[in-house]
C-alpha cells in the first residue's frame, strides 16, 4: 500500500489512512447517544469513500488544534463524538510510519487529494477486500464470502457495483466496513500475480491474420474481466497453427495476398478439372492432403500471418 502510494505520488494522503487503519476508530458512538453521535459524524461522511472520511477527520482535528489549548481541543473533540485519546494514538502511528519512510529515503511530499490515485494505492494493499454487488444489494467477496455494507457507511445508500473494504464485522449479519467505490479496471494490473485466466472459443481472425480467443480473468473467485478478445499465439500455439493452416491457408482467409496461395489454388483447380474429365478420383486433392502439405513445409513457429510473412521474407533473402 505504502509503496504503491509512493509510486502514485499520494504517500502523504495514504500514510494518514494507513495509520488510521492500524488504530481503533476515533469516532465515538455511545449506546445512549447514538443519534447525537451519528448527527455529529454526518459532517465527515463521503458518498464515495469511507477512507476519505478519515482524511476529513484528520483535517478537522488539525484545523481545530490551531489556537486552542489542550483542554479546549479535548472539549471540541468530545462535542463531535471523537476520541481524543485514540486521535493521539493515530497521530503516533502516523509519526512512526512517516519516520520509517524517511529512514528509507522515501520522499513523502504534500497532500494531493486525488481519488483514483489514493484508492489504487489502498487497493494494492487490500486486494482481498474487493467485492461486487449481487442480488438484493448483497456483496460477494473473496472466496465466495457474502456480506452487506455497514449501515453507517457513506455508501450504504449508493450500493456501487464494485467496492474495496478493509474490515469485516460479524453481528446479526456479516458486514464490511471502511469501504470505497472502485473501478474494476484497477484490479487486474495490481493483482496480476494473483489472477487466474481462462480462455474459450479460439477462432481465426481474418483482419489480423491470427487466432483470437476470449479471455476471462478472475481474482479470488470474482470475475473482474468477463470476456475480452486476446491473441492466442502465446497461449496455445499448436491450436493456432492448426487453425492457421485450415482457415488462413486452405480456405485462403487472409487479409493480404500471398502469391503461393494463388499458385497452389491454380494447381488444385487444374487437378480437379482433370479429375472431372478423366473421372480419376485419385487426382482429387483432399483437404487433409493440403493440410499435410503445408504442415510438412512450414517451420513450427509459423502460426499466423505475421510469422508467415516474416519467414517468407527471410527465405527470399537467404
Language-model segments: what does each one mean?
Residues 1-208, 230, 238, 242-245, ...:
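Second RecA-like catalytic domain
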Residues 96, 249, 311:
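Catalytic machinery of carbohydrate-active enzymes
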Residues 157, 299-318:
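Charge-rich interaction surfaces and accessory domains that mediate macromolecular binding and assembly
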Residues 213:
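Active-site and NAD+-binding cores of ADP-ribose-processing enzymes
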Residues 220-233:
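Extended, non-catalytic structural segments that build the interaction scaffolds
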Residues 221, 240, 245-253:
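C-terminal effector modules of nucleic-acid-centric enzymes and ribosome-associated factors
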Residues 226-228, 252-257:
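Mixed-charge, low-complexity segments
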Residues 257-265:
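Short, glycine/acidic-rich hinge or "gate" loops at secondary-structure transitions
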Amino acid at each position: 500500500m505504502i509503496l504503491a502510494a509512493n509510486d502514485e505520488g499520494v504517500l502523504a494522503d495514504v500514510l494518514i489512512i494507513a495509520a488510521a487503519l492500524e488504530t481503533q476508530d476515533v469516532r465515538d458512538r455511545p449506546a445512549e447517544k447514538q443519534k447525537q453521535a451519528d448527527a455529529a459524524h454526518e459532517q465527515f461522511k463521503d458518498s464515495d469513500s469511507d477512507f476519505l472520511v478519515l482524511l476529513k477527520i484528520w483535517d478537522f482535528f488539525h484545523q481545530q488544534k490551531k489556537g486552542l489549548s489542550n483542554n479546549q481541543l479535548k472539549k471540541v473533540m468530545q462535542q463531535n463524538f471523537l476520541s481524543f485519546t485514540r486521535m493521539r494514538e493515530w497521530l503516533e502511528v502516523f509519526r512512526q510510519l512517516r519516520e520509517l519512510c524517511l529512514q528509507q529515503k522515501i520522499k513523502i511530499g504534500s497532500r494531493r487529494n486525488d481519488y483514483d490515485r489514493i484508492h489504487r494505492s489502498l487497493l494494492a494493499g487490500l486486494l482481498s477486500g474487493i467485492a461486487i454487488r449481487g442480488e438484493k444489494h448483497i456483496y460477494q467477496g473473496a472466496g465466495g464470502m457474502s456480506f452487506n455494507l455497514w449501515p453507517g457507511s457513506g455508501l450504504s445508500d449508493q450500493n456501487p457495483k464494485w467496492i474495496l473494504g478493509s474490515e469485516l464485522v460479524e453481528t446479526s449479519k456479516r458486514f464490511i466496513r471502511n469501504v470505497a467505490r472502485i473501478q474494476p479496471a484497477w484490479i487486474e494490473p495490481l493483482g496480476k500475480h494473483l489472477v487466474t485466466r481462462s480462455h474459450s472459443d479460439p477462432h481465426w481472425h481474418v483482419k489480423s491474420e491470427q487466432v483470437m480467443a476470449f479471455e476471462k480473468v478472475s481474482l479470488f473467485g470474482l470475475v473482474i474481466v468477463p470476456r475480452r478478445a486476446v491473441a492466442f499465439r502465446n497461449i496455445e500455439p499448436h491450436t493456432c497453427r492448426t487453425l492457421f493452416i485450415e482457415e488462413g491457408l486452405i480456405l485462403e482467409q487472409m487479409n493480404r495476398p500471398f502469391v503461393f496461395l494463388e499458385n497452389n489454388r491454380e494447381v488444385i483447380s487444374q487437378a480437379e478439372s482433370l479429375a472431372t474429365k478423366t473421372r480419376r478420383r485419385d487426382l482429387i486433392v483432399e483437404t487433409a492432403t493440403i493440410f499435410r502439405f503445408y504442415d510438412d513445409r512450414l517451420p513450427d513457429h509459423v502460426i499466423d500471418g505475421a510469422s508467415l510473412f516474416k519467414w517468407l521474407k527471410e527465405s527470399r533473402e537467404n
